Amino acid sequence: MGAAAAEADRTLFVGNLETKVTEELLFELFHQAGPVIKVKIPKDKDGKLKQFAFVNFKHEVSVPYAMNLLNGIKLFGRPIKIQFRSGSSHASQDASVSYPQHHVGNLSPTSTSPNSYERTVGNVSPTAQMVQRSFSSPEDYQRQAVMNSVFRQMSYAGKFGSPHADQLGFSPSAQPHGHTFNQSSSSQWRQDALSSQRKRQNSHPYLADRHYSREQRYSDHGSDYHYRGSREDFYYDDRNHDGWSHDYDNRRDSSRGGKWPSSRH
């Protein structure tokens, strides 16, 4: 297999894009299916972005997985249409392999119209139908996890000046309400655990002055002091150090050869 054929096998064609869709947004979306090397939206002779893109994955196995997971997801109200790239060995299998479309509610599984795609990234509204619907299969949970992950990543981007997060129209209330987080009970649990831990430490003759939990070490600094060495800080440092990049090897694997970025205290 030649290099060109191998690259075609690792590439997807993504069509029916809304004009506001960017390479950055597609990168974040398709990265949920596997490591992405680059995303390219071609331009016409006038310099305007065309309504399709090519997504090149690092691993060939990510291609059919992304096709199955993301085909038909709406970006800014328009469902994307994913196809194998011309020349790909997967294209010959496309006619014989049926990739199931994902539907919600009472939609007919045989419907192929764009309106049948209910999995959305843009313009999510907290309707009663969305909030009350039940997830009937592990695939539904997986798709919801993809949407939540993209929402979190684009929220980080919007927090630091990217215009894409606000335009997407995400609503946290569109996430499934079957799993609720009780903040008061969690806070009480942490207080009880901390109290128990202090009792154990005070009873040990060698740990009284040396070992403290993270909560104890930073509680003395007052409520305005925040622990900065969290994974979110590492995520932000990695994602925003040099701005947006479509090079997976330089952007995603750089931390493997070295150590975690040091915390800025």
Curated annotation (Swiss-Prot):
Chain spans, region ZCCHC8 binding: 25-35, 59-76
GO molecular function: 14-3-3 protein binding; RNA binding
Phosphoprotein in keyword set: yes
RRM domain location: 10-87
Biased composition (Basic and acidic residues): 207-224, 237-256
Matching SMART domains: RRM (SM00360)
Region described as Disordered: 91-125, 166-224, 237-265
Subcellular location: Nucleus, Nucleoplasm; Nucleus
Main location group: nucleus
Any one GO biological process: meiotic cell cycle
Omega-N-methylarginine found at: R152
Keyword Phosphoprotein: yes
Mod. after translation: Phosphorylated at Ser-136 by MAPK14/p38-alpha-activated MAPKAPK2/MK2; this phosphorylation is stress-dependent; this phosphorylation decreases its RNA-binding capacity therefore affecting RNA nuclear exosome-mediated degradation. This phosphorylation mediates YWHAE and YWHAZ interactions.
Ranges of Polar residues composition bias in the record: 107-125, 170-196
Pfam families, sorted: RRM_1
Gene Ontology CC terms: nucleoplasm; nucleus
Signal peptide: none
Gene3D superfamilies tied to this protein: 3.30.70.330
Domain remarks: The RRM domain mediates RNA binding; the RNA must have four nucleotides for efficient binding. Mediates the interaction of NEXT complex with promoter upstream transcripts (PROMPTs) and potentially aberrant forms of other non coding RNAs, such as snRNAs. The RRM domain exhibits specificity for polyuridine sequences.
Function: RNA-binding subunit of the trimeric nuclear exosome targeting (NEXT) complex, a complex that functions as an RNA exosome cofactor that directs a subset of non-coding short-lived RNAs for exosomal degradation. NEXT is involved in surveillance and turnover of aberrant transcripts and non-coding RNAs. Binds preferentially polyuridine sequences and associates with newly synthesized RNAs, including pre-mRNAs and short-lived exosome substrates such as promoter upstream transcripts (PROMPTs), enhancer RNAs (eRNAs), and 3'-extended products from small nuclear RNAs (snRNAs).
PANTHER family linked to this entry: RNA BINDING MOTIF RBM PROTEIN -RELATED, RNA-BINDING PROTEIN 7
Quaternary context: Component of the nuclear exosome targeting (NEXT) complex composed of MTREX, ZCCHC8, and RBM7 that directs a subset of non-coding short-lived RNAs for exosomal degradation. Interacts with ZCCHC8 and SF3B2/SAP145. Binds to MTREX through ZCCHC8. Interacts with YWHAE and YWHAZ; these interactions are stress-dependent and RBM7 phosphorylation dependent; release RNA from the NEXT complex and may affect RNA targeting to the nuclear RNA exosomome for degradation.
Name of the protein: RNA-binding protein 7
Protein species of origin: Mus musculus
Lineage, uppermost ranks: Eukaryota, Metazoa, Chordata, Craniata, Vertebrata
